[in-house]
Curated annotation (Swiss-Prot):
It comes from the Bacteria. Pathway: Carbohydrate biosynthesis; Calvin cycle. The lineage of its organism: Bacteria, Bacillati, Cyanobacteriota, Cyanophyceae, Acaryochloridales. PANTHER family: FRUCTOSE-1,6-BISPHOSPHATASE 1 CLASS 2-RELATED, FRUCTOSE-1,6-BISPHOSPHATASE CLASS 2. Mn(2+) 1 binds at residues 33, 57. It catalyses: beta-D-fructose 1,6-bisphosphate + H2O = beta-D-fructose 6-phosphate + phosphate; D-sedoheptulose 1,7-bisphosphate + H2O = D-sedoheptulose 7-phosphate + phosphate. GO terms for cellular component: cytosol. Homotetramer. This is D-fructose 1,6-bisphosphatase class 2/sedoheptulose 1,7-bisphosphatase 1. Pfam families: FBPase_glpX.
Amino acid sequence: MDNVIGLEIIEVVEQAAIASALWMGKGEKDTADAVAVDAMRNRMNQIHMRGRIVIGEGERDDAPMLYIGEQVGICTQENAAEFCTLDELIEIDIAVDPCEGTNLVAYGQNGSMAVLAISEKGGLFAAPDFYMKKLAAPPAAKGKVDIRKSATENLQIIAECLDRSISELVVVVMKRARHDGLIKEIREAGARVRLIEDGDVSAALSCAFSGTNIHALMGIGAAPEGVISAAAMRALGGHFQGQLIYDPEIVQTGLIGESKESNLARLKEMGIDDPDRIYEAEELACGETVLFAACGITPGTLMKGARFFPGGVRTESLIISTQSKTVRFVDTIHKLDDKHRALQLH
């Protein structure tokens, strides 16, 4: 899988990032997301693969494209056996977020990117559109920190693993009212807090790289993005744990469902019998081979955003593989035609 479609999935996230970046700073988050979805889907359908969206833009009735269960790739056609190899006919699961951080793009803020993860069929946890309590930490702290422990305890462990003082640590937390207590505890423990509006996949990913000045991600965010983060962290050897949140009172928003009871019933219908289970990265992304790809839309910790110039655009992407055990950063110059359709320069 790595050798067959590795380069092509980079192009998938590049196309999504370029399309979305054209709307950076225009205050139209829905449009920035819609064009990214369209570009990502179009490029996916040019790949010789038999893909199935397991994490996407929502349920079929709510999302016209890249909905959960949608089949993508040339080899999903009825006569695919005539022009696809046996390897290409193997089913793969795909988790996507064509524009992670739509508000960031709309308001010209840092940290937005186009992301996807792929694995063989059954290799990615089909997370419901719920929230998830998350803990991400550097590889040195893998298996030592634990989401069941307090933030203070985990900060002490991370500091010891990195041979640093707690006062040197920076923890990323999403700026939400539900995190007021967590933020207070982190600061009282002596660490620093970097608040973000959106985009916790980028924050989780940054924990696994030295020199980013991000040492942990804590708090509650979207569950689908948790699976994508887990895929990246598994490939990077970093620590990631997640626990589904089904109680609207904890999240303090009405976006999770009408009630705790209805959410529990929905989880049971999905086959999730233990709603309080703590998931490790290896459970959320359990496939033998997992690939993660991302491309910066706006400037971020690991990648610069899309930069336009007369006649073209330059992007920075990365691809991470559990198969080859590599992290590749890709700096690409694209030539743009009159319709702003990106074509890679050779």
